[in-house]
A protein has these predicted regions:
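Domain-exit/linker segments immediately C-terminal to small folded modules
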Residues: 6, 149-178
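Residue-level signal for alpha-helical context at structural boundaries
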Residues: 41-44, 85, 140, 162, ...
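Short alpha-helix boundary/capping motifs
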Residues: 51-55, 95, 144, 150, ...
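Short Cys/His-rich Zn2+-coordinating modules
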Residues: 97-110, 124-129, 135-142, 159-167
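Processing junctions and N-termini across compartments
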Residues: 116-119, 138, 149-152
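Short, cysteine/histidine-rich loop/knuckle motifs that typically chelate Zn2+
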Residues: 121-125, 143-146, 157, 178
Length: 178
């Protein structure tokens, strides 16, 4: 799939939504698999080939502009759907991280606790709208402010942490929304 402009179907990016959740909903809306969306985002062009490493933490500026171009969402909102929203030391400090240089991740994780991979979830929120909230990625988040329930950290079926995918920022397949 190759495109230079907007994708035909563009769901709105919810203000509390994480970028990977939005991109997976975008894939479903356009009949694409998450790997196809990633290829659209990282394909080489005259402006360069954006990297998807650290996309949920501190994304490559090229990938932010590519997402904005394909979705019509402004770049600031795209960046705000990543952990950059929580930068400036409260609760994260991402200054040492360069998304184009993998080894710089060490500068960030040595500061103490850090949400490396995965997410918690509020089962009630997810059942309502299928949107994965960015705040659920923060280890200090324990309850859902909307429902007043504890966040769930692991799948009761398989025992794994949710949204743990070290080698791809998106899940390999998405289940269509009801």
């Amino acid at each position: 799939v190759a495109t230079r402009g907007l994708l035909p179907s563009r769901p709105a990016l919810d203000e509390r939504e994480s970028l990977d959740s939005f991109l997976e909903r975008l894939a479903i809306a356009n009949g694409l698999s998450p790997p196809q969306v990633l290829r659209l985002l990282t394909a080489a062009e005259h402006s360069g080939s954006p990297g998807a490493a650290f996309m949920m933490i501190k994304p490559d500026p090229l990938i932010i502009s590519r997402i904005a171009r394909l979705t019509g969402v402004d770049g600031a909102s795209v960046a705000d759907a990543t952990l950059l929203r929580f930068d400036d030391g409260l609760p994260l400090y991402l200054d040492g991280l360069d998304p184009l240089r993998r080894h710089t991740f060490r500068h960030v994780v040595t500061q103490g606790w850090f949400p490396q991979f995965g997410s918690q979830l509020c089962p009630l929120c997810l059942a309502e709208d299928g949107i994965w909230a960015l705040e659920w990625r923060l280890p200090l988040a324990a309850t859902c402010p909307r429902h007043g329930v504890f966040l769930t950290t692991h799948c009761i079926g398989c025992g794994h942490r949710f949204r743990t995918h070290r080698y791809s920022p998106l899940r390999l397949s998405s289940i269509p929304e009801k």
